């Protein structure tokens, strides 16, 4: 028994000396495994307390099998299923597939059906009320139709705002007008663009017919009195004999002052005038 105890104490002293010697390298995880397997009399807990890590690291990539050139043997790398993000990624992909499957197709916008009313036991669709256009609106629409049979969106919006109509009403009027124009053209009747829309247009109202703007005559103007030409002789004026006395007398006789002087003087004025001249 004494020999066994001395052997054990000597082996312990050798291990302690080799562990504390400054010339030897520090023990690693492989050394721990070596001591834990071969040192049967000591528990691994004594060696774990002296290490910086509480437990040995489980290496998936052993250093002696790792090769930078990718020449490591099979089984060196763990399969992709063991990656921590693999499961969540696959779950997300499954979620996307299920979400796309659950998504409903886009529904097509359907126009509302017209209202149906029972008349005499039979269903009858109620038509929308016809648009009543005024004579001014019809004249403006017809005038614009003469310029262009098709309107762009800005032009249609501007015309509707000017006439107080909606863009739909303007569009429908132009559609009806084009169809009627084509129908008359096919029948060989070239429609005159200058005719009044009140008598020919089916969309016209029942107001009394008014002349179109483009056909209306300008208001009659009051004729200005023209100066009557003075009577003159057939011979030119420069051929007449110039008589200064006659010309001056004629001119003087035509003035209002001459008319007053030609009036007869009242009685007694002659003596007064004679006295004035005598005093002077």
From Swiss-Prot:
The record's annotation in SUPFAM superfamilies points to:
Homeodomain-like
Ranges for region Disordered: 1-38, 189-252
GO MF terms here are:
DNA-binding transcription factor activity, RNA polymerase II-specific; RNA polymerase II cis-regulatory region sequence-specific DNA binding
* Subcellular compartments: Nucleus
GO cellular component terms listed in the entry, alphabetical order:
nucleus
The GO biological-process annotations, alphabetized, read as: epithelial cell differentiation
Question: Where is there biased composition of kind Polar residues?
Answer: 20-30, 199-208
Provide the alphabetized UniProt keywords: Developmental protein, DNA-binding, Homeobox, Nucleus
Primary location recorded for the protein, binned into one broad class: nucleus
Annotated signal sequence is: none
Disulfide bond residue pairs: none
Sequence ranges of Low complexity compositional bias: 1-13
Residue ranges forming the DNA-binding region read 126-185
Family stated for the protein in its record: Belongs to the distal-less homeobox family.
This one is known as Homeobox protein DLX-3
Starting at the broadest rank, the lineage of the source organism is:
Eukaryota, Metazoa, Chordata, Craniata, Vertebrata
Q: Which gene encodes it?
A: DLX-3
């Amino acid at each position: 028994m004494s020999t066994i105890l001395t052997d054990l104490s000597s082996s312990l002293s050798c291990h302690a000396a080799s562990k504390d010697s400054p010339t030897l390298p520090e023990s690693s995880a492989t050394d721990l495994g070596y001591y834990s397997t071969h040192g049967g009399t000591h528990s691994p807990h004594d060696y774990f307390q002296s290490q910086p890590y509480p437990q040995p690291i489980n290496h998936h990539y052993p250093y002696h099998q790792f090769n930078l050139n990718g020449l490591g043997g099979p089984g060196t790398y763990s399969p992709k299923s063991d990656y921590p993000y693999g499961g969540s990624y696959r779950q997300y992909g499954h979620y996307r597939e299920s979400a796309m499957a659950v998504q409903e197709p886009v529904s097509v916008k359907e126009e509302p059906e017209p209202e149906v009313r029972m008349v005499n036991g039979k269903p009858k669709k109620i038509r929308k009320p016809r648009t009543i256009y005024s004579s001014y609106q019809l004249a403006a629409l017809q005038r614009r139709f003469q310029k262009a049979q098709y309107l762009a969106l800005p032009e249609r919006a501007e015309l509707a705002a000017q006439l107080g109509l909606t863009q739909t009403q303007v569009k429908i009027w132009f559609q009806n007008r084009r169809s009627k124009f084509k129908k008359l053209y096919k029948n060989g009747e070239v429609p005159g663009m200058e005719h009044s829309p009140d008598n020919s247009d089916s969309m016209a109202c029942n107001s009394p017919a008014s002349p179109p703007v483009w056909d209306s005559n300008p208001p009659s103007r009051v004729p200005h009195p023209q100066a009557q030409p003075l009577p003159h002789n057939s011979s030119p004026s420069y051929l007449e004999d110039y008589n200064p006395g006659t010309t001056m007398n004629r001119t003087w006789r035509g003035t209002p002052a001459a008319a007053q002087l030609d009036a007869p003087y009242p009685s007694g004025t002659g003596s007064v005038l004679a006295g004035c001249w005598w005093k002077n």
